[in-house]
Amino acid sequence: MALATAAGGFAPLVDDIARAQERSLNPVHERYPEPQLPLAEAGGKTSPNDSLAAAIADAYATNPDLAAQRYVLRATDDEVGVALAQTRPRIDLQVSGRYDLTLPGDVTNAARPISDRLNDPNIERDELNSQLAIEQPLFTGGRAAGALRVARAQSAAGREALRGVEGDVLINLIAAYSDVRRDGRIVEIRSRNLRWLEATLDEISARREAGELTRTDLAQAETQLEIARVQLNGAQAQFEASRASFVATVGRAPGILAPEPDLPNLPRSADEAFRIAETNNPDLAAALAAQRAAEERIGLAKSEGRPVLSLRGTAGTIGPALPFVPDDQDVIFTGGATLTIPLSEGGRIRSRVAQARNEESAERLRVEATRRGVIQAVVNSWNQWVTAERNLAAQELQRKAAAIFYEGSLEEYREGLRSTFDVLFAQNSLNEAEIDLLASRRESYVARAALLRQLGLLEADRLLTNAPAYDPDAYLDRVEQRNAVPWGPVVRALDSLTAPIGKPQKVAEIESDAQTARIEEPAPQSVPGELVSSPSPQPAITVPDRVDIEGGSR
């Protein structure tokens, strides 16, 4: 029992002696750092003070592209007010004054009384006119109704365009946020690698002086050290570029960023993604609204040939201007109705209708082009997400294998079974595996955000809770209430009853003969041969003299 206790007390001393002997045989022992976990797992010592939610809230409130698009939508909504004004009364006040001085001739003087001629040989007249006119359209032939339909369709397209810009801003923000986190970690990895190589170079230099290593070992370490410096410089430049992108989108510098949170509303299958995009993609919805506006313009063009009926009443005064005496002014009241019937416009209306139909056909084709583009974008985003997730699984295994490879190479190097190059290569493999893993995590997250953008689900009010949201309808409500009159809805209802309906034309199709279509074979001489240079000498340029410039002849 006592022997066992004594043996246990000597065990630590024996271990210390063994380690001292190993250090004497291998001076580089314990100078290489142990394999480190990737930074994504090891975690930082500094607590995050910035988050994706805070960045989204700041960008939603201050991003200039998003704010500019809101004002673009407001300007589009103002067209609704312009259309509504066509059914509201128009009030004008007109005031005019006139002064006439006549130097009469013999014929005029002969007709004038002698007293007038003696009192003032000249004839002076002054007059003051004032008129208040009120005109109320009763029937515009559908012009007002058509203009209102076009304006509302344009307003709907503007709302979808605003959603699209918001999605673009958020996808840029999420990409910049992920880039800053990824590139910051890459800078840490490159810095750690540089410090490790500097320590390694010191040890190799010492061992070479001791005769244990060759000049080749030293050159290998020096080469890897300089490569590490270049890689660190590139990583730092990329990190600053990512920070600049963040500042451009958010309007402030990023802090210590927290990990990206899970994104909500992701589809469970590709088929579900296609169904959501078909009904909710803002680009497609904007194209459909623009096509509706173009269709309404057909009816608006037709309405230009319809009769217009309006009521007009005036109240005015006319009398001497100087001296102004109210009792000397005549008061005149007039009232009437005006019916205007277009009979011939020289083909202008028919041309406008044809023009509107052609524009509608173009918008309809743009809808199909947008739909195809949306499908392509959904496919690309989905596949990027799937590919990134697959790469993540493989790169997790790659990182673990690289860590084992590095640890094993280091232990074997201590035993003299591995060369300096083997250890350097293993350390570099571990670094690159960590960087590849960070890149794949970023690609996966950004691909998910890009997919949500195409589905119309990447919006601030869907991502944030209890965040103030911009309400575009508030401004439109104010536009509709400007100068509103109680009888306005009645006039609009009467005008819309007879408003013409725009009928789109059939889009002309070009027949395709894909079975017999062939690429024309080039002539033999059209095949490129040797490289050529510009001909030398260049042809001389004739400079005209002064006579030629001034238009004369030599």
What name fits each language-model region?
Residues L13-V28, G44, L101, L438-R554:
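Acidic, low-complexity, intrinsically disordered peripheral segments
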Residues E22, D50, A54, E166-T279, ...:
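Periplasmic alpha-helical coiled-coil/stalk elements that build and connect Gram-negative outer-membrane
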Residues Y32-D58:
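Regulatory alphaC helix of protein kinase catalytic domains
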Residues A57-A67, R74-R90, E124, Q131-R149, ...:
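A glycine-/polar-enriched beta->alpha junction
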Residues G97-L103, L138, A315-G319, I341-E345, ...:
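Transmembrane beta-strands of outer-membrane beta-barrel pores
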Residues L103-A110, G146, A258-P261, R306, ...:
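Outer-membrane beta-barrel translocator domains and adjoining extracellular loop/strand segments
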Residues P104-N122:
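Flexible, solvent-exposed loop segments that connect beta-strands
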Residues D126-S130, Q329-F333:
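Residues that define the transmembrane beta-barrel architecture of outer-membrane proteins
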